[in-house]
A protein has these predicted regions:
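Extracytoplasmic
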Residues: 1-4, 14-83
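Local beta-strand/beta-hairpin segments that build beta-sheet-rich folds
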Residues: 10-11
Length: 83
């Protein structure tokens, strides 16, 4: 799989626990898109707004776009970030 330098930031959570609780739902919603992604590329960390987000790192732009379209359809924020 060809990997590019794009990251996706999903959601804005006030606490680490709330991000951890929502993470399985986000991953299951996108399981078909994430099947070839290394688990180490998916993590929860603080974003620039000092809230917690789920990040999917080092993916192609096409995959990032698909993830965000699906995630936004579930009324969850999603941003594509160039690495």
């Amino acid at each position: 799989i060809k990997r590019n330098n794009f990251n996706v930031q999903i959601g804005m959570y006030k606490t680490l626990v709330s991000a951890e609780e929502d993470m399985p739902n986000i991953l299951l919603l996108n399981i078909d898109l994430l099947v070839d992604i290394d688990n180490g590329s998916i993590q929860i960390r603080k974003n620039k707004e000092q809230k917690y987000s789920i990040f999917v790192n080092k993916i192609t732009y096409a995959l990032a776009e698909n993830l965000c379209v699906r995630t936004k359809s579930q009324e969850t924020s999603c941003s594509i970030l160039a690495n």
